[in-house]
């Protein structure tokens, strides 16, 4: 099966995890909330090359936890450890000690292609995009409401756009 590039982003909350995949070829968008089996099915069905911004240093660890069938609460621990570890990946890898090896799809991380390093918001501004933020705090300690999910989905889709080449 031919591989397509899918731009991907994830958002992690205490009780919710969202993945958005946007196919480069035709813009098809697939979103998956809190469903490890659907993520596995997506990977099996589409054999994607995943492209993102800071994917190797963040989203790949979140994806590994998802593929290990971890619940959103445990995925949030991975998220918080990544943020608190300040690039010390040995701390993050420690969360996966004793876990089976998980094969990730091929990954293109555009963060490492930009020198000097720039934040995604800075790139958005430099290419004339509007800056979109979510109004939902990432430290909310309850399941998201339907309205909050719509807001987070809008934000997550927008995060895929700066890396989506015309």
Q: In which residue ranges do the predicted regions lie?
A:
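Short, acidic/hydrophobic/Gly-rich beta-strand patch recurrent on exposed beta strands
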Residues: 22
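Conserved DEDDh/DEDDy metal-dependent 3′-5′ exonuclease domain
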Residues: 25-122
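Short, conserved catalytic/metal-binding motifs centered on acidic residues
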Residues: 9, 52, 159, 163
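Acidic, Mg2+-coordinating catalytic module of metal-dependent nucleases/exonucleases
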Residues: 111-166
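Short N-terminal binding/cap micro-motifs at the start of the first secondary-structure element
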Residues: 14-19
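Two-metal-ion RNase H-like nuclease active-site motif
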Residues: 3-12, 108-109
């Amino acid at each position: 099966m031919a591989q397509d590039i899918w731009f991907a982003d994830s958002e992690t909350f205490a009780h919710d995890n969202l993945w958005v995949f946007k196919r480069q070829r035709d813009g098809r968008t697939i979103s998956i909330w809190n469903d490890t089996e659907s993520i596995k099915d997506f990977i099996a069905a589409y054999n994607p090359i995943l492209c993102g911004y800071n994917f190797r240093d963040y989203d790949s660890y979140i994806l590994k936890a998802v593929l290990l069938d971890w619940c959103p609460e445990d995925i949030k621990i991975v998220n918080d450890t990544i943020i608190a570890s300040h690039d010390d990946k040995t701390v993050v890898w420690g969360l996966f000690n004793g876990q089976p090896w998980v094969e990730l799809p091929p990954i293109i991380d555009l963060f490492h292609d930009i020198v000097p390093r720039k934040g995604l918001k800075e790139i958005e501004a430099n290419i004339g995009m509007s800056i979109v933020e979510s109004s939902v705090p990432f430290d909310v300690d309850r399941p998201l409401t339907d309205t909050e999910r719509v807001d987070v989905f809008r934000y997550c889709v927008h995060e895929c756009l700066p890396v989506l080449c015309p």
